[in-house]
UniProtKB/Swiss-Prot annotation:
The modification 4-carboxyglutamate is found at residues 98, 109. GO terms for molecular function: hormone activity; toxin activity. This is Con-Ins T1B. Belongs to the insulin family. SMART domains: IlGF.
Length: 115
């Protein structure tokens, strides 16, 4: 009887652990939680949030990007976008640093700076 009680206790403990790890983290990390974006995070976020938005809009109109049609390298595209968009952010959107580097901003707030 003590052996079966021990195994039952272990099974319940394991079940509790699995339930806690599976369901306990659902509401702890939201993809749109505010975060600080400074330095190279600004062009990276711009590439992830704004370029995807532009590319999706082109797909909706049935106009895929010519770079994607030619099978352009994603790393080349990211490097060029970082170079071009970093300059664009410095000139046109000076407020993105004040808004998202000095205090945290969500993805929705960052998308307001998309050109």
């Amino acid at each position: 009887m003590t052996t079966s009680f021990y195994f039952l206790l272990m099974a319940l403990g394991l079940l509790l652990y699995v339930c806690q790890s599976s369901f306990g983290n659902q509401h702890t990390r939201n993809s749109d939680t505010p975060k600080y974006r400074c330095g190279s995070d600004i062009p990276n976020s711009y590439m992830d949030l704004c370029f995807r938005k532009r590319n999706d809009a082109g797909k909706k109109r049935g106009q895929a990007s010519p770079l994607w049609q030619r099978g352009g390298s994603l790393s080349m595209l990211k490097a060029r976008a970082k170079r071009n968009e970093a300059f664009h952010l410095q000139r046109a959107h000076r407020g993105v640093v004040e808004h998202c580097c000095y205090r945290p901003c969500s993805n929705a707030e960052f998308k307001k700076f998309c050109g």
